[in-house]
């Protein structure tokens, strides 16, 4: 966590060659992970790292679709990840995770404090899994997103079953509204997973980068993503 005179900021420098140990500043092999970026974070990204400001605007757009683009030597990938917001009218939605890469730099930006990212860091630290370059880290994040889709889909299904049991006893407007919100969550998930699938296809077609891919890891990503898609469709059809 980064500290300034203004307070605490969710900017972390995690060394991938040192079991994701947190550093005080960027150094080679560090992953810059920023959650809920502040104005100071934006200045750091655009002024110090020279990341195109258009990339940051795209990540800020809550409706931004999964895609990949390049500018000034930087590569931006937007992945839709699941997010649980109990204070929201619809408790399960998806939000953009921006992944920005260039040479030794690997930056992730999310405008929401998700369950996925801190869990991913803890998991990697606990398992002491090696990271072999930026693409390896990218695909591991991709894999983690699908795992979290499956976790939330299980929760959604459990909630749906509970609501249906209530409706069997007596039809109440409040329960019908809950069921509609659950269905909306499933629509969000299905749409985002389809977009992530399209992104994965584009990544696999990057011939100039394919030599840096771990084929076994990419296959794991494909399997988990397909499982999440199939599960979401099954729950939606029930």
Give the ranges of each region predicted by the language model:
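Peripheral, non-transmembrane regulatory/ligand-interaction domains of membrane transport proteins
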Residues: 1-212, 217-220, 224-229
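Membrane-interface, cytosolic juxtamembrane amphipathic helix immediately N-terminal to a transmembrane helix
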Residues: 230-238
């Amino acid at each position: 966590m980064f500290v300034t005179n203004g307070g605490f900021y969710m900017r972390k420098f995690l060394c991938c060659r040192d079991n994701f140990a947190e550093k005080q500043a960027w150094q080679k092999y560090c992953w810059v992970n920023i959650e809920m970026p502040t104005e100071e974070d934006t200045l750091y990204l655009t002024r110090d790292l020279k990341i195109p400001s258009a990339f940051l605007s795209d990540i800020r757009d809550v409706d931004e679709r999964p895609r990949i683009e390049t500018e000034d030597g930087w590569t931006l990938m937007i992945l839709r990840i699941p997010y649980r917001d109990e204070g929201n009218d619809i408790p399960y939605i998806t939000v953009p995770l921006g992944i920005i890469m260039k040479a030794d730099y690997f930056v992730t930006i999310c405008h929401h404090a998700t369950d996925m990212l801190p869990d991913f860091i803890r998991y990697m630290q606990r398992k002491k899994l090696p990271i072999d370059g930026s693409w390896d880290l990218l695909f591991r994040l991709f894999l983690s997103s699908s795992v979290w889709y499956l976790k939330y889909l299980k929760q959604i299904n459990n909630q749906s079953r509970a609501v249906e049991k209530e409706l069997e006893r007596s039809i109440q407007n409040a329960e019908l509204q809950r069921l509609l919100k659950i269905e909306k969550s499933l629509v969000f998930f299905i749409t985002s997973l389809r977009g992530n699938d399209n992104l994965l296809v584009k990544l696999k077609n990057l011939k100039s980068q394919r030599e840096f891919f771990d084929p076994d890891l990419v296959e794991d990503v494909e399997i988990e993503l397909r499982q999440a898609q199939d599960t979401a469709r099954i729950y939606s059809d029930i």
